[in-house]
Amino acid sequence: MHATELNTGHGSQRAIRLAPSILSADFARLGEEVCAIEAGGADLVHFDVMDNHYVPNLTIGPLVCEAIRPLVSIPIDVHLMVEPVDALIPLFAKAGANIISFHPEASRHVDRTIGLIRDHGCKAGLVLNPATPLGWLDHTLDQLDLVLLMSVNPGFGGQAFIPGVLDKVRQARARIDRQVDAGGRPVWLEIDGGVKADNIAAIARAGADTFVAGSAVFGAPDADGGYSSILYRLREAATVT
């Protein structure tokens, strides 16, 4: 892992994690692309799964996850934008996912879905769209490993960051910090959508520690085809004091 530490002012250091989204990668060279982001310093591979039902787009499934799993040692962070969600969880766990996140609207029983992810040996995340209230965390935060806040409406890459989500990030960070201060489990706070070098510092200051970036990474390769430079710039910008 390449995560760097961020001084939060909350009495502890908070790691910064970068999770390039392969939705923006060159799919004709996907194996090379995931190897390049790991070599460039990525902490996670973000894997967007869309079903043309929960969101109006269709992407990739467990076979692709299984194909890239032997190529990288960093965790695969699977974001399920599918409905219903439960049937796919065992398939992605078997394919090598380390983290599986889902949208509460896509589950009939959110608590059961979280348990299903954990039962299959993966870390569990809950994804909240820009208009989905943080109230979903009231009875789930103590079971989660990750909260993923969408800063665009899910379905397509390359969208612009919604600035109003920053206040939601601050509120989610406060909830997580209260849980940790009370002796509860730490939870990663991930942001996905429109993350770029010119806004990642503001997002980090609001409290995010894990950053999904698609076109910002894969649209800025080095001359040798790698991604070390852009990942370094993103990490430096996110490491605010």
UniProtKB/Swiss-Prot annotation:
A divalent metal cation binds at residues 46, 48, 79, 192. Pathway: Carbohydrate degradation. Coiled coil: none annotated. The active site is at 48 (proton acceptor), 192 (proton donor). It catalyses: D-ribulose 5-phosphate = D-xylulose 5-phosphate. Its EC number is 5.1.3.1. Binds 1 divalent metal cation per subunit. GO terms for biological process: pentose catabolic process; pentose-phosphate shunt; reductive pentose-phosphate cycle. Keywords: Calvin cycle, Carbohydrate metabolism, Isomerase, Metal-binding. Pfam families: Ribul_P_3_epim (PF00834). One of its GO terms (molecular function) is D-ribulose-phosphate 3-epimerase activity. It is an enzyme of class 5 (isomerase). InterPro entries: Aldolase_TIM, Ribul_P_3_epim, Ribul_P_3_epim-like, RibuloseP-bd_barrel. Its cofactor is a divalent metal cation. Belongs to the ribulose-phosphate 3-epimerase family. HAMAP family: RPE. Catalyzes the reversible epimerization of D-ribulose 5-phosphate to D-xylulose 5-phosphate. NCBIfam families: PRK05581.1-4, rpe. This is Ribulose-phosphate 3-epimerase 1. The gene is rpe1.
